[in-house]
Amino acid sequence: MARMMGPRFKQSRRLGLNVCGHPKANKRMGKGLGRNDKKLTEYGMQLLEKQRLRAYYGVNEKQMHKYFEKALNNKEGLTTGDVMVRQLETRLDNLVLRASFASSIRQARQMVSHGLIRVNGKKVDIPSFQVAEGSVIELKEKSRSNELFKENYETNFAQSLPYIDKEENFKVTLTRLPERQEIPIEITDSLIVELYSR
């Protein structure tokens, strides 16, 4: 399992984004260690964007570099950055978060690792599992009465994305692969590509 070390609120302030899913983190992001406290060099900007993307998806450096290498060799006619972000977006743990089963990427990863998630009717307990277009993701039936999961799902049910179809019984479908502009992350991925291309 990928581990993002350090206090989550502090990391949110340093990176300028909510990496823990806690509403209080949004209030603290602008205090103390914000992104703009000092002028960054070009390398510093590239490094910060990479750290932010890693934090969004909760992946470690080794995983991140693998996604870059796969994207670099893509034959789809898309930019390396677009393919890299799309691969991250369609990880199972991230789609569990997008489905509103979980309130943070950490919680989503735990749910997958503990065997609570089904993909096309089969248990998948690998957070990095790459979900294919048309796949159905659902919460294990015995876990659907869990109050925390119910609150997550009911509170955020209306928040959807054009490539995800939600149903009311803890079931979602990845209807198609996402376009880069549809993925709701504030990242300049070209800076990350430049960093890894050095």
Curated annotation (Swiss-Prot):
Keyword tRNA-binding among record annotations: no
Family to which this protein belongs: Belongs to the universal ribosomal protein uS4 family.
Residues forming coiled coils: none
One biological process term in Gene Ontology: ribosomal small subunit biogenesis
Protein name: Small ribosomal subunit protein uS4
Function text: One of the primary rRNA binding proteins, it binds directly to 16S rRNA where it nucleates assembly of the body of the 30S subunit. With S5 and S12 plays an important role in translational accuracy.
Gene coding for it: rpsD
SUPFAM superfamilies with a match to the protein in the record: Alpha-L RNA-binding motif
Signal peptide: none
Subunit structure: Part of the 30S ribosomal subunit. Contacts protein S5. The interaction surface between S4 and S5 is involved in control of translational fidelity.
UniProt xrefs under PANTHER family: 30S 40S RIBOSOMAL PROTEIN, SMALL RIBOSOMAL SUBUNIT PROTEIN US4M
RNA-binding recorded as keyword: yes
Keywords: Ribonucleoprotein, Ribosomal protein, RNA-binding, rRNA-binding
Entry GO CC: small ribosomal subunit
InterPro entries associated with the record: Ribosomal_uS4, Ribosomal_uS4_bac-type, Ribosomal_uS4_CS, Ribosomal_uS4_N, S4_RNA-bd, S4_RNA-bd_sf
Gene3D superfamilies with a match to the protein in the record: Ribosomal Protein S4 Delta 41, Chain A, domain 1, RNA-binding S4 domain
Stretches assigned to the S4 RNA-binding domain: 90-152
